[in-house]
Amino acid sequence: MKLQREVYIAGVGETKFGKHTVDFDVLGREAALQAMNGSNIDRPDMIQSAYVGNGMNDMTTGQAVFRGLGMCGPNLPIINVQSACSAGAMAVFCAIKDVATGVTDLSIGVGTENHTMHRQSGAAFSAARSDIETMHGAVMTGKYAMRATRYMHETGATIEDLAMITVKNRKHATHNPYAWFKGAITVEEVVNSRMVAYPMTLQQCCGIADGAAAVVVGSKEMMKKLGIAKPVKVAGVVVESGPYHNRPRDITGDDITETTSEKLYEESGIGPKEVNILELHDAFTIAELLYYECMGLCKKGDGLKFLRDGQSTYGGQCVVSPRGGLLSYGHPIGASGAAQIAQNVKQLRGECGGYQVGPTPKVAMSHVTGGGLSGTEHAACTMHMLVKGW
């Protein structure tokens, strides 16, 4: 989406991810309140539109969230967004779109989810419950397992290589107070954890979590009015829908991620080698390897070398998932994309303490896919490019 005027992040908020005993509306409220307080907002009616992403819980999630803040009523349009794992990021996209087009000067995007209190089966992640692939057991873990075995066949990668992704991301999460799983784990421990779908062992699969995140966005004029001291600019944002494939294709690629990232680079004027921080959709270890290549961080087939050479960790070309990624942070479906953005904002502001990426990161990118459409293709993909300063 071409931004018609400059848009900035005013404030962000998030809850700790994991298992919660309070419902999605309470979690969403906590994150939204944090984001608004961090934006120096002294009156709730300053927010002119609200978008709330949710994957599995309620048809009026947004109204439930803002009801408890006394913000429901005729002067605040609250729009609910459903797009599976991409829902939270898409809610932020919609808020950005409002500000970019001049519809509002200050908007909020929220993602919230509680799976502990609202259990769902893996079939719920399909674009259609009657989809023949899902009916025959082709759920997400199985699809990523097939991609992993093909990648191993083509590149010579081993299950131990895949396990290195979990080891890296768990190490990144060590000092992150919001992460669910943290602390050192070895390649052997990852490989020897329970097999789910070869070669995906349990520790190579993200944990489905509860949690929420929120992002307040506004115009440049509004940022100055609010006295935002550490501005973060939205350099670009792209939402894509996946193509339908009815023929054989390369399952080690990801058409929707390639298309979305190419458009984002063009829109923002920023190339993959200029990105300092990347939060990507590492729902499974193999996903991170494939996305290195799909987003142009390295050449096709060089993802494993990129990992082994330390290019995706501190001191490398681009720190991938410094918060710990979905593999360590947990994955509350509708909230994950918004949390990626919130964490990138904190990194660009230098607020991440023990897991801060260097003293002066300037560019941060986030990527999240949502649902399944056909074969290994995703139904949706949302990407944001953020830069430090005005």
Curated annotation (Swiss-Prot):
Membrane-crossing residue ranges in chain numbering: none
Binding site for CoA: K19, S121, G122, R194, C205, C206
Superkingdom assignment: Bacteria
Pathway: Xenobiotic degradation; toluene degradation
EC number(s) given by UniProt: 2.3.1.310
Residues the record marks as active site: C85 (acyl-thioester intermediate)
Primary enzyme class: transferase
Catalytic reactions on record: (S)-2-benzoylsuccinyl-CoA + CoA = benzoyl-CoA + succinyl-CoA
SUPFAM superfamilies: Thiolase-like
A GO molecular function held by the record: acyltransferase activity, transferring groups other than amino-acyl groups
Protein name: Benzoylsuccinyl-CoA thiolase subunit BbsB
